[in-house]
Curated annotation (Swiss-Prot):
CDD domains: PT_UbiA_COQ2 (cd13959). InterPro entries: HB_polyprenyltransferase-like, Prenyltransferase, UbiA_prenyltransferase, UbiA_prenylTrfase_CS, UbiA_sf. This is 4-hydroxybenzoate octaprenyltransferase. Pathway: Cofactor biosynthesis; ubiquinone biosynthesis. Keywords: Cell inner membrane, Cell membrane, Magnesium, Membrane, Transferase, Transmembrane, Transmembrane helix, Ubiquinone biosynthesis. Pfam families: UbiA. Catalyzes the prenylation of para-hydroxybenzoate (PHB) with an all-trans polyprenyl group. Mediates the second step in the final reaction sequence of ubiquinone-8 (UQ-8) biosynthesis, which is the condensation of the polyisoprenoid side chain with PHB, generating the first membrane-bound Q intermediate 3-octaprenyl-4-hydroxybenzoate. Its cofactor is Mg(2+). The chain crosses the membrane at residues 23-43, 46-66, 99-119, 141-161, 163-183, 212-232, 233-253, 268-288. It comes from Salmonella paratyphi C (strain RKS4594).
Length: 290
């Protein structure tokens, strides 16, 4: 019986950290890889790559824990989240806090193997991860904070590789914020009706009937900034084809969200994994030395 209870708790932690749903980690991973490949340029050192890949998974898990901790009083009133570990009682508040601390400490131990500039920047990463979940109570722009949190690995990657933060770093950071606002607005469109009822704020509510238009403008901004990064770094034509393919995926997403149906909006959100992948492949091929 004791083993069964332990197994149930581990499964609850697994769900709390969303390790059963890798989409969030992938949306965090792709910009990290973009930055590492541009900063190097090309293939980064294997240890630095390993630290950032592991750090992505640890900090995404930590972010999910603190997000559910912040929303524990709201999730019980939303159909999609009512069975999450905290509102259902599968994980206690103390256990969630302890799990968050363990995940953050593991990530910080990895960062300690890098240079001082990267270690210093990691403090801001922790602050953003902690602050984001609470923003939806106070502002209709929590997605901007999410973009900063998901994109903070970009300056950290540049710092780890070159101990500098060039223009390309900040253009990529801005592109990631625009992208995150676009895809997380799609995600928020799924819960918009429930969020209005319980007082949660989001860009999906703020944008209202202009949501699809503004998402389209943000997506155009992402393409423009990524193309500019390619030009600044002298990338080849294959990279720009990747940017165009990403644009085609954005067009597909616009078609999906046109009628604002929940399942279609969620499908559009999930499709952003391919946007990140395509842009990374474009970068990797541009730096490939035959």
């Amino acid at each position: 019986m004791e083993w069964s209870l332990t197994q149930s708790k581990l499964l609850a932690f697994h769900r709390l950290m969303r390790t059963d749903k890798p989409i969030g980690a992938l949306l965090l991973l792709w910009p990290t890889l973009w930055a590492l490949w541009v900063a190097t340029p090309g293939m980064p050192q294997l240890w630095i790559l390993a630290v950032f890949v592991a750090g992505v998974w640890l900090m995404r898990a930590a972010g999910c824990v603190v997000n559910d901790y912040a929303d524990r009083k709201f999730d019980g009133h939303v159909k999609r989240t009512v069975n999450r570990p905290l509102p259902s009682g599968a994980v206690t508040e103390k256990e969630a806090r302890n799990l968050f601390v363990v995940l953050v400490l593991l990530a910080f131990l990895l960062v300690l193997t890098l240079n001082a500039m990267t270690i210093l920047l990691s403090v801001a990463a922790l602050a953003l991860a902690w602050v984001y979940p609470f923003m939806k109570r106070y502002t209709h722009l929590p997605q901007v904070v999410l973009g900063a949190a998901f994109g903070w690995s970009i300056p950290m990657a540049f710092a780890a590789v070159s101990e500098s933060l060039p223009l390309s770093c900040w253009l990529m950071f801005l592109a990631n914020i625009l992208w995150a606002v676009a895809y997380d607005t799609q995600y928020a469109m799924v819960d918009r009706d429930d969020d209005i009822k319980i007082g949660i704020k989001s860009t999906a509510i703020l944008f209202g009937r202009y949501d699809t238009l503004i998402i389209g403008i943000l997506q155009l901004g992402v393409m423009a900034l990524m193309a500019l990064i390619g030009w600044l770094n002298g990338l080849g034509g294959g990279y720009y084809w990747a940017v165009l393919v990403a644009g085609a995926l954005f067009v597909y997403q616009q078609k999906l969200i046109a009628n604002r149906e929940r399942e279609a909006c969620f499908k559009a959100f999930m499709n952003n994994n391919y946007v990140g992948l395509v842009l990374f492949l474009g970068l990797a091929m541009s730096y490939w030395h035959f």
